[in-house]
A protein has these predicted regions:
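Residues at alpha-helix caps and immediate loop-helix transition turns in enzyme cores, especially N-
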Residues: 24, 62-66, 93
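Catalytic active-site module of serine/aspartate enzymes centered on a nucleophile-bearing elbow/loop
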Residues: 75-111
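Conserved loop-alpha-helix segment in the C-terminal half of the alpha/beta-hydrolase fold
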Residues: 43-44, 51-85
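Solvent-exposed, non-transmembrane amphipathic alpha-helical segments
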Residues: 32, 44, 48, 70, ...
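Alpha/beta-hydrolase
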Residues: 1-53, 57-60
Length: 111
């Protein structure tokens, strides 16, 4: 992809060659256990300010249904979808991600 330079790709290849990808795979292997460990949170709401920031072309959005976030995010909530960005939005569009984060944080009131 145009957002990943050859140098960055070489870095990832070197690191995964050195360390393997067990950590990343274990996240998926442990998914059922994660649901079990967080079962007590079913129905809980988020009252702290929350920002949902994603790429509008992220295929995960198809089953995640971010439009339902306001059912659980009952405090101040903002959603930002970056057009044309995919799953790795922070790598694909770092300046826009940082700008959205800073804008969100600046809008918070200190308590």
């Amino acid at each position: 992809p145009d957002w990943l330079t050859a140098e960055e790709l070489d870095h990832y290849i070197a690191e995964f060659t050195r360390t393997g990808f067990t950590g990343g795979l274990n996240w998926y292997r442990n998914m059922d256990r994660n649901w079990e460990l967080t079962e007590h949170l079913a129905g809980a709401t988020i009252t702290a300010p929350a920002l949902f920031l994603a790429g509008a072309a992220d295929p995960v959005l198809g089953f995640m249904r971010p439009e339902r976030a306001t059912e659980v995010a009952v405090g101040p909530y903002r959603q930002v979808l970056l057009d044309g960005a995919g799953h790795w939005v922070q790598q694909e569009r770092p300046q826009e991600v940082n700008a959205a984060l800073i804008d969100f944080l600046r809008g918070l009131e200190l308590q």
